[in-house]
Structures are given as structure tokens and as C-alpha cells.
Amino acid sequence: MPDDLFDALGRQAIPTIGQDSGAKLNDHQLGGFDEYVTHSRLRNKNVISPSSIDAETAQLQPLLMRTESLTFLEELVNTPSPTSYETRGQRVWLDYVKKFADETTHDDYGNCVAILNKGGGPRIMLAGHADEIALSVNYIDENGYIWVKRMGGVDAIVSKAQRVTVHNAKGGVLGIIGNPPPHMQKVDGEPKVPKITDLFIDIGCSSRKASEKRVRIGDPITVNQNFEILHKDIAVARAFDNRIGTWSVAETLRLITESKRKLNAEICAVSNTMEEVGLFGARQIAYSLDPDVALVVDVTHATDYPGISKQAHGDIKMGKGPTITHGICNHPEVVKRVEQVAVKSKIPLQHETVSATSGTDTDAVFWTRGGIPSALISLPNRYMHSPVEVVNLKDLEQIPKLMGAFAESINTTDSFSVKI
């Protein structure tokens, strides 16, 4: 990938593994997208975000979460991190978590690690993936329209008529995913379900030459839908999948650090890359760290809204706490310990099962090297892989508490092995 695009997304601002990760992005690297976001916020005065809640609104919409933690979540979600171009989001994560870590590092593909109690044992990996589903520029036609490829599980149906940003070497270009009005859509029989190859982006240019001055083949594209409070503890955004995971592992380090309780284990909080396109980053960093046990955090499907079959997908509700998953990649002894600390800490847990794979980084971690004992903790999420994912922040707050309690429960002699 070209160096100037890496510069624009900030990759070269992150030091190599073993160095302190305190470098800052400069104004040129931040580019035009940040200016676009700022102006968008000013235009949309009805958006409720933790940085703009007045006293009256706060009374109407009480937020239980610590203000700094909520602001961190908002910044993580609002910072574009298209899969395989996660660097800007990784910088946000590192800047926050370094206050609670002994050391922060990253590898060549941008998988970031914050280590607490280095040299302790056993080694625990707490992992969430930093990337989000995205599109990329595939073709520019003679009229300047951009045609795209999918990066991850983008739903073409909900993508139409969305505002997007094409991330170029200078920052970002505003675009619209085109959609003919209903008056002009001819339907014979059943309506046609759109495919990714049907999507085109209008950036306001009328020729290929004009568009090529602004974007190029391979530029990543993300939807412009930022964090908002929907009502009380309910929030909506694109990319809660899986900023809630990277937020959770960072907050776990904070809780452990601030508790000042004795810690035996070495904690490696991980913000890994490229989950949405093959679980690649988790596989890379799990191999490098070689942990004794791993907890993976991701979203799961809430099934508490119309049109979803509980018989097929289980009974998972928002507001009832995170879930623990049973089966396959989830080691029974790790799951048992998670359940025990949840009971002791009075943290509500819901239960779900998998029949083959979980579709998360747990699938990659558990068979890395000789097999790393792992478990999946998930946050119920409505409307996953859409621009309007909805989660309960009270559920989210339970996850770092649960992982922190798990980490603090570990003794130096503990091992996770099936009892035979």
C-alpha cells in the first residue's frame, strides 16, 4: 500500500514493537476528514453526544458511565477504522490506554498491545478487534461515479442512500451512495435485492478525470454515522462492532490499575486488526504473545426486536448483561471461571451456544500454536453490520468489570486444562 496513504491514516506515527507509543499525529496526517466531522457536528445541533450534553439534557438522559470513559467510547466509534486501515483508531486507543499500562507496543500490521504487570504469570490476553466493515474504490466510470468492493460483511440493502467518506491520501472525500427514487424504480414481480456490485458513489464529479484527482483505486470507504445517545442507557452508532471490544479491554486495564489490588497475572490488552475479513490480526498477535489464556470481546445478536426467531438464534436481550458463549472454541474451564467470577461479583450473564464457529476472533485464537484456552464474552447488539447498531451502555460497563474480576482471580499456579 502506498506510503502517502499510510501517512494519511497515521500508521507511520505509531512506533515499532518495543518502543514507547507516545507519538502524536500531526495536522497534515489528520487531513480533511476531521474538519468534515467537526463541521458536520456543528450543522447537526440535535445530535446528543457526551461532549455536547447540556445540564437539561443530562437530566432527561441520565448516563451511568464515567464521563471520561464515555468520551473515549465516542471517540473510538467516531474515528474511522476500516478493516486493514485501522491506524487512526489504534492511535486513539493507545493514547488512552497508555496511562494504565506498563508498556504499549504494536506489530507490523498494527495490532496494538498494552501490558500490565509485565513478567507476572500466567499471561492473560484480553482482545477486541479494532476494524469495522467497509468498502473500497474498485472502478471509476466515465461519468465520475465510483463503484466499490466489499471489505467485510457490508449489507448492500442498508448501504443505499448513505453518506460516506472515501479516505484518500489527503484526508477524506464526502460521497453519497446513490439510490433511484421510488418513483423511478420499475418493479416486475418481487423487488430486486441489491448486490454490492450495484452500489455506486457520487462524489459530485462529472468525469473520470475529475474523480481521479480526488480518489484512487483501493481507497477505503466508511459510512458517516456517529455516536449518539438514543435514550438513557441506549446508544446508536455504526461500528459498535467492535469498538466496544477495544473499549472494554482498555477499561479493564483502567479498573485493575485503579483498584490497586494485588495482581499475579500479566495482562496483555489487545486491540487487533482485520477481524472482519478473516480473523487475521488476532491470529498474528496471539501467536506472538503466546498467552496462557484468552478472553475475546465482541458483539452478539440481540434477539429482542420484531422479526427475529428466538428458536433459531436464541433469547438474547439488551439490558440483561453481556453473554458468555458455550461450545467449540470456548474452553469449558475458562467459561467456568468466568461464570464463577460473575456470580461472585454480581454481574449478570446471559448464555448462548455455537454449533461450529463463533464468527469471532475466538475461532482464530483457540487453535493458535498448540491451542490457547479461550472464551468469548459478547455485548448484545441490535441491527449488527448496519449504520445504526444499537447497544445498552449498562450492559457494556459490565464487561470490563467481569474481565477485571477474572484477571484478579488468577493465581500464579492456575492453568486451564480439561480435566480427564
Identify the meaning behind each predicted range.
Residues 10, 33, 39-420:
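N-terminal hydrophobic/helix-forming segments and targeting peptides
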